Amino acid sequence: MLITQLKAKEAITSLTAGKKVFIINCHGCKEVRFPEKEAARLQKELAAEGNVTGIMTTDYICNPENMELRLKKHMSKIQEADLVLVFSCGVGVQTVSEYLEDKMVCAACDTYPVPGFQGVTPLEYKCDQCGEGYLNLTGGICPITACSKSLVNGQCGGSKN
């Protein structure tokens, strides 16, 4: 099971300030606790600013075939946006980021693990569910799982550092 928690409002608004935003919500896995009410409230606030080009709510965005079909329907609105803001677990953000390579894709949620079922993605994605949400800084690549030492603060220091 996973728990997704919204990032701090200040962190999200700093990402979206002055940008046109397309929002993607994932309501897929029943095993994922998703803060629907809080996300809806925040999205209404963002939309009130007039910078939201569209909102897509779907399920299982971690399934690439499903995601591709859904995104194609909204591609004109996505192209208008400077930023795609994804309200899902880290794997969902990675799936969207992989498909929309020419767009800035940011996570609006942090992901935390709870023992048990971990979602339905048929592929190997790398998210350690650390709750830090580094995906916004790294183009959808989790540095915790991509680095054998889980370093996030620079190059590998080798055996001495």
List where the protein language model places each region.
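Iron-sulfur-associated redox domains of electron-transfer enzymes in respiratory
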Residues: 1-158
